[in-house]
Amino acid sequence: MSNQRDPRYDVLFEPVKIGPVTAPNRFYQVPHCNGMGRMFPDSMIAMRGMKAEGGWGIVTTEQCDFHPTGDVQPFTETSMWDDGDLPYLAAMVDAVHEHGALAGIELVHNGQDSGCLYSREVPIGPEHRPVTWHQHPIQARAMSRGDIRDYRRWHRKAVLRAREAGFDMVVVYAGHDGTVPSHFLSRQSNQRSDEYGGSLENRLRLYRELIEET
């Protein structure tokens, strides 16, 4: 039996340039949670390094919450609340780079779905509404324009920390209806009447600002 690869798939093994960086191939390990994160960083680092060793061209963290108001305890993820989180994230980057892969980080704030059981902060979102992911009587607070400016500042600071840790890529995440950008995008959770609500252009405004500032 021949072990020769079907030439139709050769492109998957070719380098690809993404902005200023080049991945060694087209195999991208998407962000996924694994129950390790900040609670078991050594295991998380070893697992991500193993993926790079196995041939993945880009290895990405699970979602990484970047501010105490986005605390999703009791779920275990990575976090980048302050400089104290940099050492274990930088060690993950080193483990990935050791095998020639790019390291990515997915920055996430769960907004109105943040229970904040550890941080004890008040969750934030486009409008006042109950937190839906937890069996606790928690109410999210509507973000003022000042809150939105703060949120953008927190995100920029997290991007700079990610850069300091050595990450090659940042995922500005707005998926699965569980993040601040996705809450602003949805008519169901965003019924604001200012420049961040109403039309699709307005509901996209925060996401565009985050991308441009990243």
Kindly label every feature range from the protein language model.
Residues 2-28, 96:
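N-terminal amphipathic alpha-helix/helix-capping segment at the start of soluble metabolic enzymes
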Residues 30-43, 75-81, 112-116, 136-157, ...:
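Active-site mouth loops of central-metabolism enzymes
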